[in-house]
UniProtKB/Swiss-Prot annotation:
Comp. bias (Polar residues): 46-56, 485-501, 634-645, 754-763
Residues with the Phosphoserine modification: 14, 310, 529, 538, 748, 758
UniProt record similarity statement: Belongs to the protein kinase superfamily. CMGC Ser/Thr protein kinase family. MNB/DYRK subfamily.
GO biological process: amyloid-beta formation; calcineurin-NFAT signaling cascade; cardiac muscle hypertrophy; circadian rhythm; negative regulation of cell cycle; negative regulation of DNA damage response, signal transduction by p53 class mediator; negative regulation of heterochromatin formation; negative regulation of microtubule polymerization
Oligomeric form and interacting partners: Interacts with RAD54L2/ARIP4. Interacts with CRY2. Interacts with RANBP9. Interacts with WDR68. Interacts with SIRT1.
Positions carrying Phosphotyrosine: 111, 140, 145, 159, 177, 219, 319, 321, 449
The protein, known as: Dual specificity tyrosine-phosphorylation-regulated kinase 1A
Reaction(s) this enzyme catalyzes, per UniProt: L-seryl-[protein] + ATP = O-phospho-L-seryl-[protein] + ADP + H(+); L-threonyl-[protein] + ATP = O-phospho-L-threonyl-[protein] + ADP + H(+); L-tyrosyl-[protein] + ATP = O-phospho-L-tyrosyl-[protein] + ADP + H(+); [DNA-directed RNA polymerase] + ATP = phospho-[DNA-directed RNA polymerase] + ADP + H(+)
Known role: Dual-specificity kinase which possesses both serine/threonine and tyrosine kinase activities. Plays an important role in double-strand breaks (DSBs) repair following DNA damage. Mechanistically, phosphorylates RNF169 and increases its ability to block accumulation of TP53BP1 at the DSB sites thereby promoting homologous recombination repair (HRR).
UniProt keyword Transferase, yes or no: yes
Length: 763
């Protein structure tokens, strides 16, 4: 220990010692009061002379390093302590708990304020604001790849854009006026994106193929007039149509349409499916639902199928997740291979919904959908579930080899035992129709309902191989001879004032002569969609509301008798069944004997085509100045990748198809009365049913009419070109549309009723 007079061995300038620990406590208190410094190295303690250091005890000197170490840590902690504290009202915990509603309101205010400001900037003329926004496709597109529609815009000196009428995942649909053809059209504008373009090109190819085989436009498929590229968007020009069957149901307050009108829709749909099943087409629609079936005229029952955006040809199936859920077939739910039979399942669901007003199977998800199907139809056959990849998603196999429904995970939904929710009761076969609303009405007898129920059950067969096919469905006894019926929903919409005001109106129609010419029209003011090709009519004026949308009549009065289909064996003569597909047109079919219904036919068989020419009476061009702009349809599609065409080279069953029109179709027997369909009703289903999966499609002889004005390219295909600067190539001209003739027609109370279009869903 050094004495007081001794000096330290170290240089005084190098010593920076703190006082003793007891003294430093006061020093810390003083340090806390001093202003904080950003550089701790600038904060120094007072210098201590060598004499003071020598006077310290040894124990105090030992504690000095510890004091030097503790002091910086405490000072650092003091510096980290906030000098001011947050207002408790603004704390996140409070905002997300006690003040949660207030927080959400503030978020909404900020969000909508920004949205409103952007909207105002978009409409303003200030160029400075427009420069701030990102430009897509030279300013023609929005950030969703959709074309920015401007009302009144003129495209290629031909199309005048009127308004946006529909929007979906595929793009948009606009109403436009074609100055060249002088008619209203619906233009489907595809998104400016490769995936949507590829899928739309498939739709174009299928529509061209169908229109090529249906030049008379009598198989209820929407007519694609032409297509072109405009500002990097593929545009499809369709004929003008009216609203869809879902809109019609909504107009009945979801009470459903009459059984007679349901029959009209059913027969047209079966004819369309028969057309799609021809071997040259073999097209699966894949998305049949009320929204995709459109009325040609709001006053009439003629319909057309639209939206082939998710369609494919047999053998080119690339998707497993298809069809809207309510109308999804069991084989699709179970992950099995599918064919054209899935569209027949969808049709069965649609027909029940059109009459009852409610979906038959309204599942919230796939499991719920299957459970609701089982409620009505029971457990699917074991041989189907044994082969289904997704069977155990819905069912479980018991030790004895049978299958039963799995219990739902949530346990909230309670279902009726399998097969106990009878279609008999859903349709109200013996109780006056659905909800008893049809009791006492003409055409709604128990016998009528029994025929309807039998047809629906055949359409809803679990096994796609034994599910009824369009050819046999058209021969079902449900399709009896009926007069034309408009979309009259007077018995269903008692609460609609607009409907009640229209119920008192009525019209009569003149019938055409037996020569096949169109000699008159109804005085209801129905006219062709082409204003330059008006038929002479006996009324005096045309109703402006439907002048641009009449597309119901496709063929004149013709009575056709087709030869018996090739491939029938045996000596028993086939039964002749006369099918009246038009009020003035009849077609005779040869129904196969029961035991020899259809056999595979190999080799080259000759096809017989019957051509009937139209004779029209014309007068001058109709003025367009006062034409009312009708509503048209929305047609959403599903995007998918491109598919290549594939020929179906399997053996087919040869038979003849209906020559049908958009008017009411009915089946009657020319030789056996009501027993004309006996050959079909008693046929052994399992033995004689066609297997679409193996044979491709039914070989149906369809009458094909050539179009002398159609330009063809290689292999007879229509020629067309894509151009962003020039007008579209006219590769598909309009087929002749004659005025539909018939007797005892009723003016529909739908006339003049503005029906709100259903929202477009992304399917």
């Amino acid at each position: 220990m050094h004495t007081g007079g001794e000096t330290s061995a170290c240089k005084p300038s190098s010593v920076r010692l703190a006082p003793s620990f007891s003294f430093h406590a006061a020093g810390l208190q003083m340090a806390a009061q001093m202003p904080h410094s950003h550089q701790y190295s600038d904060r120094r303690q007072p210098n201590i002379s060598d004499q003071q250091v020598s006077a310290l005890s040894y124990s105090d000197q030992i504690q000095q390093p510890l004091t030097n170490q503790v002091m910086p840590d405490i000072v650092m902690l003091q510096r980290r302590m906030p000098q001011t504290f947050r207002d408790p009202a603004t704390a996140p915990l409070r905002k997300l708990s006690v003040d949660l509603i207030k927080t959400y309101k503030h978020i909404n205010e900020v969000y909508y304020a920004k949205k409103k400001r952007r909207h105002q900037q978009g409409q303003g003329d200030d160029s400075s604001h427009k420069k701030e926004r990102k430009v897509y496709n030279d300013g023609y597109d929005d950030d969703n790849y959709d074309y920015i529609v401007k009302n009144g815009e003129k495209w290629m000196d031909r199309y005048e854009i009127d308004s946006l009428i529909g929007k979906g995942s595929f793009g948009q649909v606009v109403k436009a006026y074609d100055r060249v053809e002088q008619e209203w059209v619906a233009i489907k504008i595809i998104k400016n994106k490769k995936a949507f373009l590829n899928q739309a090109q498939i739709e174009v190819r299928l529509l061209e193929l169908m229109n090529k085989h249906d030049t008379e436009m009598k198989y209820y498929i929407v007519h694609l007039k032409r297509h072109f590229m405009f500002r990097n968007h593929l545009c499809l020009v369709f004929e003008m149509l009216s609203y869809n069957l879902y809109d019609l149901l909504r107009n009945t307050n979801f009470r459903g349409v009459s059984l007679n009108l349901t029959r009209k829709f059913a027969q047209q749909m079966c004819t369309a499916l028969l057309f799609l099943a021809t071997p040259e087409l073999s097209i699966i629609h894949c998305d049949l639902k009320p929204e995709n079936i459109l009325l040609c005229n709001p006053k009439r029952s003629a319909i057309k199928i639209v939206d082939f955006g998710s369609s494919c040809q047999l053998g080119q199936r690339i998707y497993q997740y298809i069809q809207s859920r309510f109308y999804r077939s069991p084989e699709v739910l179970l992950g099995m291979p599918y064919d054209l039979a899935i569209d027949m399942w969808s049709l069965g669901c649609i027909l029940v919904e059109m009459h009852t007003g409610e979906p038959l199977f309204s599942g919230a998800n796939e499991v719920d959908q299957m459970n609701k199907i089982v409620e009505v139809l029971g457990i699917p056959p074991a041989h189907i579930l044994d082969q289904a990849p997704k069977a155990r998603k819905f069912f479980e196999k018991l030790p004895d080899g049978t299958w039963s429904l799995k219990k739902t995970k949530d346990g909230k939904r309670e279902y009726k035992p399998p097969g106990t929710r009878k279609l008999h009761n859903i349709l109200g076969v013996e109780t006056g129709g659905p909800g008893g609303r049809r009791a006492g009405e003409s055409g709604h007898t128990v016998a009528d309902y029994l025929k309807f129920k039998d047809l629906i059950l055949r359409m809803l067969d679990y096994d796609p191989k034994t599910r009824i096919q369009p050819y046999y469905a058209l021969q079902h006894s449900f399709f009896k001879k009926t007069a034309d019926e408009g979309t009259n929903t007077s018995n269903s919409v008692s609460t609609s004032p607009a409907m009640e005001q229209s119920q008192s109106s009525g019209t009569t129609s003149s019938t055409s002569s037996s020569s096949g010419g169109s000699s008159g029209t109804s005085n209801s003011g129905r006219a062709r969609s082409d204003p330059t090709h008006q038929h002479r009519h006996s009324g005096g004026h045309f109703a402006a509301a439907v002048q641009a949308m009449d597309c119901e009549t496709h063929s004149p009065q013709v009575r056709q008798q087709f030869p018996a289909p090739l491939g029938w064996s045996g000596t028993e003569a086939p039964t002749q069944v006369t099918v009246e597909t038009h009020p003035v047109q009849e077609t005779t079919f040869h129904v196969a004997p029961q035991q020899n219904a259809l056999h595979h036919h190999h080799g080259n068989s000759s096809h017989h085509h019957h051509h009937h020419h139209h004779h029209h009476h014309h007068h001058g061009q109709q003025a367009l100045g006062n034409r009312t702009r009708p509503r048209v349809y929305n047609s959403p599609t599903n995007s998918s990748s491109t598919q290549d065409s594939m020929e179906v080279g399997h053996s087919h069953h040869s038979m003849t198809s209906l020559s049908s029109s958009t008017t009411s179709s009915s089946t009657s027997s020319s030789s056996t009365g009501n027993q004309g369909n006996q050959a079909y009703q008693n046929r052994p289903v399992a033995a004689n049913t066609l297997d679409f999966g193996q044979n491709g499609a039914m070989d149906v002889n369809l009458t094909v009419y050539s179009n002398p004005r159609q330009e063809t390219g290689i292999a007879g295909h229509p020629t067309y070109q894509f151009s962003a600067n020039t007008g579209p190539a006219h590769y598909m001209t309009e087929g002749h549309l004659t005025m539909r003739q018939g007797a005892d027609r009723e003016e529909s109370p739908m006339t003049g009723v503005c029906v709100q279009q259903s929202p477009v869903a992304s399917s």
